[in-house]
Amino acid sequence: YTGHDVREISHKESDDNDIAVTTACIDEIIENSKRNGWKSICFVTGVPGAGKTLVGLNIANRRHRFNTGDEEHAVFLSGNEPLVTVLREALTRDQDEKRKQVCDSCKKTKKRQDRDCDNCKFHLTKEAIFKETKSFIQMIHWFRDDSLLDGHPAPIDKIAIFDEAQRAWKKEKLSNFMRTKKGQPHFDMSEPECLIEYMNRHRDWATIVCLVGGGQEIHDGEAGISE
């Protein structure tokens, strides 16, 4: 993952300008939501290879601000475990290589890398980088299950990006799963309802970005964009 794109990871056929325009539009919606205290939902649609995942990753990568005090942290959620594994490893390797490079600040002072320099991030270990990467690329069912914990407040994430949102489970399928696998006999929501309710616990603003592939529902019980 170099230069804020994933051409080596996620095949895409869209023009770069289309992706830039789409990303800028979503960024504007996020900024308006922050400024006005709004809750917003965006739907990014397209055929396979259109660049939906790339748009979502670009936003998550720029806006994951865990531990900065900005209260904006973004999370990229996917039900595709191989994709999550590959993205985490690729991002970790890329950031690990970048941290070894001397930054402009250290060059100007004619120093070798300063272990306390935030630009170099020389002080970070590969394990620490991987932990940071895990905070903004997650399996969607882990995020969903967090919402079920007793007394669990709103998530730390103000921006949730759902990859392949058309594959979200219908109420019947998710309710049955929660009853039989999670010990939640009274659960009565679809996966979209559950995730929206979780993000709606924020008292001020929040933005949900749904990446939707039309007609790409694969298994029974997957809701499609209508849900």
Sequence positions of predicted segments:
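Core RecA-like ATPase module of SF1/SF2 helicases and allied nucleic-acid translocases
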Residues: 96, 104, 126-130, 136, ...
